[in-house]
Amino acid sequence: MLKRQGFTSKRLIVLSAVFMLIGYNLTAQSDSASYWKKHFDVNGYVKFMQTFSGDMEGEIYDQSLWHNRFNLKFNSQTKNGGTEFYLESRNRIFYGEAVQINSFMKDTLSKDVGFLDLSFSAGDERSFLFGGTFDRLWYKGYYKSWEWSLGRQRINWGINSYWNANDLFNAFTFTDFDYEERPGSDALRIQKTFKNGANLEVASSIGADSSTVGAAKLGWNIWNYDFQIIAGKYYGDYVIGGGWAGGIKDWGFKGETTYFIDLEDSNKSAVSLSVSGEYILKGNKFLGLGALYTSNGLSGSADVSASLLAFQASPKSLMPTRWSAMATYGGEFGGLSSYALVFVYLPGTKFGLLMPSITRSVAQNFDLSFHMINVGGSMNNEPVFLANGFVRAKWSF
């Protein structure tokens, strides 16, 4: 059996610092600036986010977060192919009341679900917590119609706008708006593109406990629609599914479904199905509608207010409830500002989420934004409500 490979916290810190210094030096050397500009790309951002959380009893908790991302890319091209290497780190510092009352936060930050242990934490809940991870560390090569990659990467098989039942390797929770890059997995991927535009992709990933996911995806275009079918194994389940993306008149129309087959216990087999439609309105405004069916989700009355915010999605369980419906509306104003309003309703549980946001470009590479995640509903004829507000400043480099 393969054993998980780990790094000590000190080695990770040193490795992160070394690569940051290399990236800085490469871009700073004037005598070979053209070479480094051609083959290397360094970028990232620094964010500060203040969070306030409140409940029906009037209790309010705060949390402050400093968030840094550093991305380093190397590329070398030949006549018919090329090579690319990516190293990306995510570093966060938390402090505040919400950190002090969460005794599991430090363990959560240091937990790495990949085969390589590339995450670590430091600090104390009574003062501050630091969490660092390399969520991208991978190599990509390509030659003519072939492409291959190895390492911690994002394999995106999702085609639906909101819920991705086909995304076997990197399912994400849509309420985690502060993680735009989304998680990666330790995987090997090989892709072949055919002359008619069709493509075949095979991928396999391994987790911290040596559990594996392996599948193949075939994609093609016909009738102005993109279609795909997938088949493989998702941990202990065999899977088969597919998806589409096209349009009906002026509406975009997307969907995907996956059937998870448990050969040992048929009661644990599950179906995940999602559809969505998008429409562009006048004045650069956007309207979106989506629905999700999860056969193993909750269908009766239940208090899901807390679990919605901490829910860890998987393609087999994208939401904790059996049925979910979503409506989104967004647009721009003043040329430098944008807004969005997202509403999610969970039939049966009598709960819903309301997530408004507004973003303002203050200067080049500097944005300010305000977000809210409000969860409300009824349990035993009693109202339940949780409010979370986020103020965020982001500087990109």
What are these regions (language model features)?
Residues G247-V344:
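Detector for outer-membrane/organellar transmembrane beta-barrel domains
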Residues G81-F85, S145-W148, G197-L200, N224-I229, ...:
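Repeated loop/turn-to-beta-strand initiation elements of outer-membrane beta-barrel proteins
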Residues K38, D62-F70, F130-D135, Y142, ...:
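Residues that define the transmembrane beta-barrel architecture of outer-membrane proteins
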Residues R360, D367, H371-N374, V384-F397:
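Outer-membrane beta-barrel "beta-signal"
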Residues F48-G54, T78-N80, S89-Y95, Y143, ...:
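Transmembrane beta-strands of outer-membrane beta-barrel pores
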Residues K79-A198:
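Outer membrane beta-barrel
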Residues F70-S76, R136-G141, L188-K192, A216-W220, ...:
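Residues on the lipid-exposed face of transmembrane beta-strands in outer-membrane beta-barrel proteins
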Residues S32-D55, T83-L87, A198-L200, Y339:
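Transmembrane beta-strand segments of Gram-negative outer membrane beta-barrel proteins
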